[in-house]
């Protein structure tokens, strides 16, 4: 999803580098590496994406002794995936920076199959859902219906909205209402618990409000859900229900300061 804001002619033009890190040398870690590589390979074959290069770091363990004990630390299996693609015209690319429009609106788009992840279900995503999301977003970037975009990843929807606020130094006001895409499966209360922090595939896009109905209709035909998540305005993130019950109301400066704390403390320890 990190590449989707740049116009790419097709998914098959994307090339992937895979860097696997593991503490191999035992049956468990060797098997996990084999299963991980196979899963990535199968997924990329379904997407028609090649993995021409990669790198392996398979000695990710260390041991040391003290006077009384021996210690061993093993790295868990991880795959670092880097994707690149040729771009015909970089001037068509969009970013997280809002564009001037008469009636700015933010919308959350995600595959319909996300709605099947009830309660504690293990997240998964099908190649068909990736293709649909890619095609929908790319088409509407090219025709300039999508003006800005940020993918939903670590931290879920709420972090995505917060990062948009930090980038643009503009807040968001969002009145949460029952959404026809979700209210058949989740109550409003469950939506508020699940969706703000769900780290499932999706994106928040800036559009002009006059195009919302047309875009939502187009998304529905591609098995993609789309719902409004507020308007960029002011200097606060203000999320309320239709009954004016406050869910979140924070100054974006305070949120950005809290958001930066982890990086600040890591840097302070590392650079000391």
Predicted regions and their residues:
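A glycine- and small/hydrophobic-rich beta-loop-beta segment
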Residues: 108-112, 119-149
């Amino acid at each position: 999803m990190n590449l989707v804001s740049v116009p790419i002619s097709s998914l098959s033009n994307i090339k992937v580098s895979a860097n696997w890190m593991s503490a191999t040398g035992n049956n468990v870690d060797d098997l996990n590496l084999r299963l991980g590589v196979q899963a990535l390979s199968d997924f990329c074959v379904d997407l028609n994406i090649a993995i021409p290069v990669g790198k392996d770091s398979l000695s990710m363990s260390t041991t040391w002794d003290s006077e009384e004990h021996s210690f061993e630390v093993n790295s868990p299996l991880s795959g670092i995936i880097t994707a690149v693609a040729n771009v015909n015209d970089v001037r068509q690319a969009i970013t997280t920076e809002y564009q001037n429009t008469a009636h700015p609106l933010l919308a959350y788009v995600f595959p319909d199959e996300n709605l099947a992840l009830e309660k504690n279900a293990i997240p998964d995503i099908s190649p068909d859902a990736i293709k649909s999301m890619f095609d929908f977003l790319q088409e509407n970037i090219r025709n300039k219906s999508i003006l800005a975009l940020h993918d939903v990843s670590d931290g879920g929807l709420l972090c995505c909205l917060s990062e948009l606020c930090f980038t643009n130094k503009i807040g968001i006001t969002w009145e949460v209402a029952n959404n026809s895409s979700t209210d058949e499966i989740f109550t409003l209360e469950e939506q508020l618990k699940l969706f703000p922090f769900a780290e499932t595939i999706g994106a928040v896009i800036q559009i002009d409000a006059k195009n919302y109905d047309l875009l939502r209709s187009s998304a529905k035909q591609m098995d993609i859900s789309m719902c409004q998540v507020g308007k960029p305005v002011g200097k606060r993130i203000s999320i309320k229900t239709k009954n004016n019950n406050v869910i979140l109301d924070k100054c974006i400066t305070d949120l950005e300061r809290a958001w930066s704390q982890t990086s600040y403390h890591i840097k302070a320890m590392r650079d000391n």
